[in-house]
Amino acid sequence: MSYPEKFEGIAIQSHEDWKNPKKTKYDPKPFYDHDIDIKIEACGVCGSDIHCAAGHWGNMKMPLVVGHEIVGKVVKLGPKSNSGLKVGQRVGVGAQVFSCLECDRCKNDNEPYCTKFVTTYSQPYEDGYVSQGGYANYVRVHEHFVVPIPENIPSHLAAPLLCGGLTVYSPLVRNGCGPGKKVGIVGLGGIGSMGTLISKAMGAETYVISRSSRKREDAMKMGADHYIATLEEGDWGEKYFDTFDLIVVCASSLTDIDFNIMPKAMKVGGRIVSISIPEQHEMLSLKPYGLKAVSISYSALGSIKELNQLLKLVSEKDIKIWVETLPVGEAGVHEAFERMEKGDVRYRFTLVGYDKEFSD
């Protein structure tokens, strides 16, 4: 099929006016031998999109098309493609579009930790091109970072899995989440909601840990076994002493999380893993020697192997994540940003209606 030489997206024009993006045409990256072009039909709205758009993580080159939970169909394969994907196949792209694929990290399914990592938008490739994301009609990426979407997962539900879902699945699977384990999910936002559903599907006894009881009913509907409202339970670490094998911190900010209370609730050898990337000014404060055989670490995204595992799990277990859809476009992106900033979403947004917004 034919498609335009320039791509078109809903682009952030400045950090100061980040909630009011404009439809913008731009040059795609050069097409290399192992690249794939994808015509986009849905894209999730991730908290990272807001952090980048608003400048929370520093100044970005503008204009910038964000969005890294992309679902669409293959329209072009590079001449040396060996991915097994076909033109017309429905596929997904998450928050990473390049790594060296040659270092020990890449060869051991740790692509997100490669020193040549390129994120789906806002980061320059080695040739200087700054990556552009999925609030657009097309995206061009290396084939390694393109995955097939199982037929029984609708596009609007598949999209949030590609970053948010993977980001919480990776620390769960790497740290033994499963039958006989007690797992805590801190923060019932978009990622925490998926973490709750995924942890239960993996067979763990699952606790949702939040500041108040406001989301208790939703947590129970998602299958949580227990709910802890930390501001209402005092020293909850003492109350739940020696309970958790694993806690995954999904909260967008670390400011209100007391890492000196949480270790009390951990079993010996327990692990606390944060997937949050807070604003630049935030710092983690710990009392010396307070961990007592408990480890605290950070997890970034997840591997392509893990993404395929996650999609298989969601397909086989028929997991239905909680998603609202909005039409892609200047107004739709504005609404998504406004509502996400206010916390007015249950629990992820997916942009749809790409065929109506973009015409080749």
From Swiss-Prot:
Homodimer. Belongs to the zinc-containing alcohol dehydrogenase family. Transmembrane segments: none annotated. Zn(2+) 1 binds at C46, H68, C163. Its EC number is 1.1.1.2, 1.6.-.-. Disulfide bonds: none annotated. It comes from Saccharomyces cerevisiae (strain ATCC 204508 / S288c) (Baker's yeast). Zn(2+) 2 binds at C100, C103, C106, C114. Signal peptide: none annotated. The gene is ADH6. Keywords: Cytoplasm, Metal-binding, NADP, Nucleus, Oxidoreductase, Phosphoprotein, Zinc. GO terms for cellular component: cytoplasm; nucleus. It is an enzyme of class 1 (oxidoreductase). NADP(+) binds at residues 47, 51, 188, 190-191, 210-211, 215, 250, 252, 255-256, 275, 277, 298-299, 301, 348. The keyword ATP-binding does not apply. Optimum pH is 7 for the reduction reaction and 10 for the oxidation reaction. The keyword Oxidoreductase applies. One of its GO terms (biological process) is aldehyde metabolic process. It catalyses: a primary alcohol + NADP(+) = an aldehyde + NADPH + H(+); (E)-cinnamyl alcohol + NADP(+) = (E)-cinnamaldehyde + NADPH + H(+); hexan-1-ol + NADP(+) = hexanal + NADPH + H(+); 3-methylbutanol + NADP(+) = 3-methylbutanal + NADPH + H(+). It is found in: Cytoplasm; Nucleus. GO terms for molecular function: 3-methylbutanal reductase (NADPH) activity; alcohol dehydrogenase (NADP+) activity; cinnamyl-alcohol dehydrogenase activity; hydroxymethylfurfural reductase (NADH) activity; hydroxymethylfurfural reductase (NADPH) activity; zinc ion binding. This is NADP-dependent alcohol dehydrogenase 6. The modification Phosphoserine is found at S131, S359. Binds 2 Zn(2+) ions per subunit. The lineage of its organism: Eukaryota, Fungi, Dikarya, Ascomycota, Saccharomycotina. Its cofactor is Zn(2+). Present with 21700 molecules/cell in log phase SD medium. NADP-dependent, medium-chain alcohol dehydrogenase with a broad substrate specificity. Aldehydes exhibited 50-12000 times higher catalytic efficiency than the corresponding alcohols, therefore the major function of the enzyme is as an aldehyde reductase. The enzyme is active towards aromatic and aliphatic (linear and branched-chain) aldehydes. The enzyme is very active towards aromatic aldehydes, such as cinnamaldehyde, benzaldehyde and substituted benzaldehydes, such as veratraldehyde and panisaldehyde.
